[in-house]
Amino acid sequence: TLRVVLDDPEAMESFTHAPGQVGQLSVFGAGESPFVINSPPSRKDYLQFSVMQAGEVTAAIHRLSPGDKVGVRAPLGNFFPYNDWKGKDIFFVGGGIGMAPIRTIMLHLLEHKADYGKISLLYGARSPRDMAFSYELEDWLRRPDLDCTLCIDAPFEGWEHKVGLIPNVLLELNPD
């Protein structure tokens, strides 16, 4: 997870984005890549990005230290049409680092829960160690206003949730 604070406090305070939009992060000397802004729009003190190390730019991001400078162009791209979802039940399905954009919209919907119907999440990963945002998932499992189902691909000692591939667990849940 990378947290970015803009140099200009006024720009940071006035920055707006919608759930699902991305930011183009530039690491000087390494290049640039787009990443989902996964802090909720209500967060005004920093922008958060989840970066899985997979290439030169992401490796450079993983080598950053607090206070290092990066370039940011944001917000970019489309966003979730959450205003169209008001009053409706919503079911999210995601896996691995694909949780990054889902997390953003989930945080927004949970902040405005009264505007939406039932919110459900099916999230899976290869193993418990591969679960993104595990600290929040534990909180979400305890929320009475959220139906959260977690799964991993294969049995793992101590795992108390579903075991199986996401499509198979989805069939088992049989959402309407």
Functional labels for PLM-detected ranges:
Residues 1-68, 125-127, 153-155:
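Ferredoxin-reductase
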Residues 56-176:
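FNR/FR-type flavoprotein reductase catalytic core
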